[in-house]
Amino acid sequence: MPKVMLIGYGNPLRTDDAIGWRAAGELSAQLTGDDVEIVACHQLNPEMAEAVAQTDLVIFIDACTDGTPGRVSRREVQPAAFSPELMSHHLDPESLLACAKELYGHAPKAVVICVTGECFGFGRELTPTVERVLPGVLELARGLMKKPAPKAKAAKTVQ
């Protein structure tokens, strides 16, 4: 079972809302091993609670609308107070942690990495503003997971 779970979420068809998907995809290509599970999804839902409860750390990566576009913030989150109303079709990180704790007896340490988006209109590419901060988001996530950055591959010489 993975010790770390990274969940990148948002709408991959709404420009900067895809930052969680992009980060999850790039980290998935860079990291290997049984100690990390990486998930890209449209939204958080109660069905994720069991997998979350089986980890030591969960990292959420999402877009937000408040602040200056391209701003990256990090905050630790705690489980919300549990109530049956939390069991809706989609959750915020605090509610997902509450479900994990209530249903499976454990809520791991949790961190949200949020990137302020510039555009949430229809589109499949990040804006240049958000694209520029993606490497920093990946570095922050790897640091939280205690995973070093991948080494650059040496360029092939063609003669």
Language model regions located:
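N-terminal catalytic or cofactor-binding beta/alpha core of small enzyme domains
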Residues: 1-115, 124-136, 140-159
